[in-house]
């Protein structure tokens, strides 16, 4: 039961965050801001988390997942409350900065807790990712409709309600339910930890983190820039929300097939193949502005990117010791946040000069390069470090 409560909480928080991210882009244009300013606004989401991701992972390792998740939950609620009270550009910036670091607290805490529970890690991570995909699917679908009919503040109010429900549900969990995400007991013996950079000498771990960063940042690119692209070609906010939800729903569907595909083809081949196929979908977005074709393309894009995200997380945990999982998962997200921070500023300039569609073309090239040169040894099929001490049920 605690496992499923954590999954529901994850869905509620993902819903609240994913419902508002595309609306921030759309609403900013109504305030008269475009291209470069929007790029900086989108990048602000990643600013603090880019600087603190690996350190946040260490905080999760040393302070425990329960405390960090609760701090993150309060932060997300505050991030939604501020622009709801005062909807102007300054509070949108402040909201995105707080949202980015708070979401990081929640994600790392839940990932470490779920990934170290008893059972098959592949299935645990797939189920966890499925709960997030449900939130990603429902969030834009609901917010697109609500924003079109009721406006900005009602949209953020609904998102806040989902987050508040998640906070209230967290009180159903006991301290022991977070056991698998709590600090490892060392029986009085100081833990001798090598530098995280020494861990990254492992080529496979390094590649898993790099692939993860590229995949996660590509998903964020969709959330941030497709609303602008859709608006430019005449799509309504409801239609944009439907396309984003369709993409997320395919991400959900493909995760139901993930375990079987990995067993049939192999985890490494599935991950490399989905990155390559994702590159083609970004290229096709650049080549068309027909809404129906875009919906189909984004459905496939959601499926391919949705497969790569949980697989890279499994690799990151399999290739690192359990007492360093928070730090490694944080480092994994720091690569994502660096790309999220730098890319919107660069892409905002590119979009201003060459059009928003060119952003998808550039990312297609990045994914092609990643699929060709960043690979993981197919021989690695399970954990190389034993689980210990805090395995939870």
Which residues are covered by each model-predicted region?
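Juxtamembrane intracellular "pre-TM" segments in multi-pass secondary transporters
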Residues: 1, 175-209, 392-393
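Helix-loop boundary and gating motifs at the non-cytosolic
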Residues: 1-46, 206-211, 215-233, 240
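Residue-level signature of mid-helix packing/kink "hotspots" within the transmembrane helices
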Residues: 46-54, 136-137, 248-256, 340-341
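Conserved MFS/SLC helix-loop-helix module at the cytosolic interface between two early adjacent transmembrane helices
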Residues: 51-87, 265
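Helix-to-loop junctions at the C-terminal end of transmembrane segments
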Residues: 52-64, 147, 254-266, 351-352
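Structural signature of the two symmetry-related core transmembrane helices
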Residues: 67-81, 160, 269-284
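Cytoplasmic helix-loop-helix junction between adjacent transmembrane helices
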Residues: 97-133, 315
């Amino acid at each position: 039961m605690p496992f499923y409560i954590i999954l529901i909480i994850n869905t509620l928080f993902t819903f609240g965050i994913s419902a508002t991210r595309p609306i921030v882009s759309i609403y900013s244009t109504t305030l008269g801001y475009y291209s470069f300013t929007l790029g900086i606004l989108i990048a602000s989401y990643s600013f603090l988390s880019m600087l603190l991701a690996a350190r946040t992972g260490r905080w999760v390792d040393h302070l425990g997942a329960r405390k960090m998740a609760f701090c993150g939950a309060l932060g997300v609620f505050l991030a939604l409350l501020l622009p709801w009270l005062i909807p102007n550009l300054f509070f949108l910036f402040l909201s995105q900065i707080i949202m980015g670091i708070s979401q990081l607290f929640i994600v790392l805490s839940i990932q470490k807790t779920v990934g170290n529970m008893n059972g098959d890690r592949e299935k645990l991570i797939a189920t966890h990712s499925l709960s997030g995909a449900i939130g990603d699917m429902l969030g834009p679908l609901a917010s697109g409709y609500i924003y079109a009919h009721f406006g900005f503040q009602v949209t953020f109010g609904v998102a806040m309600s989902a987050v508040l429900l998640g906070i209230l549900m967290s009180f159903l969990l006991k301290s022991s339910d977070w056991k698998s995400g709590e600090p490892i007991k060392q029986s009085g013996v100081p833990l001798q930890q090598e530098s995280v950079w020494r861990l990254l000498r492992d080529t496979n771990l390094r590649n898993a983190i790099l692939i993860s960063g590229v995949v996660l940042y590509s998903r964020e690119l969709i959330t941030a820039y497709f609303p602008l692209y859709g608006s430019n070609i005449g799509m309504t906010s409801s239609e944009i929300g439907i396309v984003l939800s369709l993409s997320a729903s395919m991400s959900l569907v493909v995760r139901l097939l993930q375990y079987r595909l990995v067993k049939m083809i192999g985890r490494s081949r599935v991950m490399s193949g989905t990155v390559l196929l994702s590159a083609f979908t970004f290229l096709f977005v650049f080549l068309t502005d027909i809404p129906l074709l875009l919906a189909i393309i984004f459905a496939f894009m959601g499926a391919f990117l949705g497969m790569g995200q949980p697989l890279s997380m499994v690799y990151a945990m399999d290739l690192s010791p359990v007492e360093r999982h928070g730090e490694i998962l944080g480092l994994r997200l720091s690569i994502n946040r660096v790309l999220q921070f730098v890319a919107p500023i660069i892409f905002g300039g590119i979009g201003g000069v060459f059009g928003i569609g060119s952003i998808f073309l550039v990312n297609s090239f990045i994914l092609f390069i990643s699929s060709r040169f960043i690979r993981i040894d197919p021989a690695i099929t399970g954990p190389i470090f034993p689980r210990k001490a805090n395995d939870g049920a």
